[in-house]
Amino acid sequence: MLFSRPPARLSWILAFQPSQKLPRYSPRFFSISVSRFAIDMEAVDTTKRLSSLRQLMREHKVDVYIVPSEDSHQSEYIAPCDGRREFISGFSGSAGTAIISLNEAALSTDGRYFNQAAKQLDNNWTLLKRGVEGVPTSQEWITQQAEGGKVVGVDPALITGAAARSLSDALQKSGASLIGVSQNLVDLVWGNDRPAPPREKVRVHPEKYAGKSFQEKVSDLRKELENKKAAGFVISMLDEIAWLLNLRGSDIPYNPVFISYCIVTPTKVELYIDDEKLTPEVKAHLGDDVIIKPYDSIFADAKALFEAKKKDPDAPSSKFLLSNRASWALNLSLGGEDHVEEIRSPIGDAKAVKNEVELAGMRACHIRDGAALIEYFAWLENELVNKKSTLDEVDAADKLEQLRSKQELFAGLSFDTISSTGPNGAVIHYKPEKGSCSVIDPNAIYLCDSGGQYLDGTTDVTRTFHFGQPTELEKKAFTLVLKGCIGLDSAVFPKGTSGFALDVLARQHLWKEGLDFLHGTGHGIGSYLNVHEGPVGIGTRVQYTEVPLAPGNVISDEPGFYEDGKFGIRIENVIMVREVQTTHKFGERPWLGFEHVTMCPIGQNLIEPSLLSDSEIKWLNDYHAEVWEKTHKYFENDEVTRKWLERETRPISK
């Protein structure tokens, strides 16, 4: 279902023959006890919701029902109306899959959310911890639940074609089948309480910030179509549509995108969007180059494209291009595997390589953003230490947003601010809530992960401070994380190197102590777009081996360490890939490195200088000198902030 309005009926069923069974897992064996940390994320009682859902499952002859996190566009962050997984499970993290059988319910999520999920899931649910040895994957758990020829159902608009095929193959081995259920069953349970779809106005993103006209971008895409002899490209990723057409929106919190689809063929561009979202300025911007069509007509039009192609004697072998992240429903509407070529999106690849205008904007917005952060941390220390004020985590986050909002070209936050004191910092994607969050303890570690949206760029920065006297353990852990951050920032590598290959640089010092962190080291960042952007990144994900880093990529460098129930440490800078000069040119190939653009001091009293090498101390002192040089002018009339900045950027030595 697309929002509250279903598309044309989808009745695709994949049936399979019985085969060998997977090992049986005890459903409750993998549940975990709730960790103790000072936040109040009470579990929602899901008993009635699950009972209603199971009744609908019986009516639709479904034995196991899958509820993904994503919307119809496979978005990581979604509009409130698409929060189906949170509604049915009570878990509010951004990543996870809910699986409901007629007798059991499980939630699979990754290491960022283990603590949060354990707290928010009630006793109806089993927590499946991804990547933990001995814990079944979501697919394994589904397959076990479906043994004996049972039927697994999913809304085909919420799962990719690749994921559907992979699950189908696994189910075949256990004698089960997968069906697409066009009417989303969770929506039926949610009923009138489900939030309305967003109706925000779309805005033009001027070329002075985009660096390239949308007509040029479409022309580049058509060259890709020509090279592949493709009938067209059907685009479903919201940030790709926004980037391609130089438009921005407000349909998804913190992500300046708008709910839409787009089809580009060799002769036309069609944008599928609710017309009421388009202002006269946007329509003038698009002009005659883009045809506007109703959002709901995408599936019917996709099917019509397929039918027309079948009748075209000149294009019997041409296929439609579709992102490998597009929905199963869209794939099937275009005729399925025989008529669709699923690829890594050429728009995603192009968007990840920022042009010179975008890179200049990223540098500029990070300086302004750094000024806001510096003023914030100086204010926070003064309030806690000198004034002995009582501030909770939300009070602090609100102050940071206020300071950011004063900066030129500010357009909002890029994600919910993670303002966390003491043990809350160990919850990697902690979200403080007014009334239940903690009072900031000046004698505990304070971790703040935050970011801003600016017309000329997007920021994402984490800093960890201690406003009292840190313990030796805290200082050692912080310094090991800092060494990893410096190691990645300082890397020089040949063209063709992937982020997967560089990940060890951020972890090696922790590994030597038998420590690690359960999240990626770096993710791509959009230019006044989504704060999480593919296809490049730094980490152990297989997809990070597929696309080598290239000049113009903008990514995060964010190693961390988390002591459950005690504290969390993370240092995050945004870095840009650039070509560097080396003494030698082995193989005559280009060599690459990084340029950091985040401008905010790194907490000095948490550093143990004896653990740093001479080159690491030089890096830190050079970095702090750069922060001072680029930001001190903002505080000529602010003595408190200026003195704090002077202290926090002073050179250190062993």
UniProtKB/Swiss-Prot annotation:
Quote the EC number.
3.4.11.9
- Enumerate the cofactors the protein uses: Mn(2+)
The EC category is: hydrolase
Which GO molecular function terms does the record list? metal ion binding; metalloaminopeptidase activity
**Binding site residues for Mn(2+) 2:** D449, D460, E572
**What is the residue range of the signal peptide feature?**
none
Q: Name one GO cellular component term.
A: cytoplasm
Q: Does the keyword Manganese apply?
A: yes
Q: Give the matching CDD domains.
A: APP
Q: Coiled-coil stretches, from where to where?
A: none
Keywords, comma-separated and alphabetical: Aminopeptidase, Hydrolase, Manganese, Metal-binding, Metalloprotease, Protease
Q: Which InterPro entries match?
A: Creatin/AminoP/Spt16_N, Creatinase/aminopeptidase-like, Creatinase_N, Pept_M24, Pept_M24B, Peptidase_M24_C, Peptidase_M24B_aminopep-P_CS, X-Pro_aminopeptidase_P
What's a single GO BP term from this record?
proteolysis
Where does the source fall among the domains of life? Eukaryota
Keyword presence, Protein biosynthesis: no
- So where does Mn(2+) 1 get bound? D460, E558, E572
* Catalytic activities: Release of any N-terminal amino acid, including proline, that is linked to proline, even from a dipeptide or tripeptide
- How is the co-factor bound, per the entry? Binds 2 manganese ions per subunit.
Q: What is the stated purpose of this protein? A: Catalyzes the removal of a penultimate prolyl residue from the N-termini of peptides.
Q: Family assignment?
A: Belongs to the peptidase M24B family.
Protein name per UniProt? Probable Xaa-Pro aminopeptidase P
